[in-house]
Amino acid sequence: MSLYQWFVFFLFIQLVHFLGTWKLYVAAGRKSWEAAMPVYNVIILMKIIGRPSWWTILLFIPVINLIMFPIIWVETLRSFGKRSTLDTFLGIATFGLYIYYVNYTQKLTHISDRSLKAKTTTGDTVNSLLFAIIVATLVHTYVVQPYTIPTPSLEKSLLVGDFLFVSKINYGARIPMTAVALPMVHDSIPLTKSKSYLSWPQIPYLRMPAAEGINRSDIVVFNWPVDTVHYFFEPKGKPGVIKPVD
């Protein structure tokens, strides 16, 4: 999908959000139009469900947002008294569309002072696991990632099977091109041969700003655009540098 197509999809999601939640905004003491304003509507929703505004950022980070959306659906339902296991199941199983049913058919009462702490040990454990997965995925995808050397191409300095951590900040982390993927899994689901991602939709090639350029003798990790296997190499030259070949 091109950036234009993603923009159109973003506007479509805003329409879906508005139609399914505007009565919830009104019940929480907000204006109905606030549910229709892109980005601003999410900030207001965070206030309605009693969560920090910086959660809004997580909803726009690829891979991380796949974890955050179900959390937001459940938190929204609970903010209006829908706390049962069935409500939680329906909210997730219908990809949030259960909120439409609540929005248009139920008597809406906003619980502004609800407790944000889990009432059971299981609930507390799930919350802790979700938080750990989000942090680990954020670090794994955009900050640093562990790799195992797959080939003997650098055998004079690194051996096959060597384990190392690779910084993604130095040369600029690449935004994941697969919008739907399992967190912290590279290519296939463990113990299976199934792909851990969907080939469509795809995000156009984007890369975050680099902290520094590539220098000679740096160990660099890369993969071909059409390949999922990562390779390691040690650059011996830079663009514009003339090197004699014996």
What spans do the regions from the language model cover?
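Feature marks short, highly hydrophobic, charge-poor N-terminal signal-anchor/signal peptide-like helices
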Residues: 1-9
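Phosphate-binding glycine-rich loops and adjacent basic patches that engage nucleotide phosphates
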Residues: 2-3, 32-39, 119-126, 212
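A broad, low-specificity signal for short, low-complexity segments enriched in glycine/proline
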Residues: 5-6, 17-20, 123-129
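Membrane-cytosol interface at the C-terminal ends of transmembrane alpha helices
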Residues: 11-111, 143
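Extended hydrophobic leader/signal-anchor segments used for secretion and membrane insertion
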Residues: 115-246
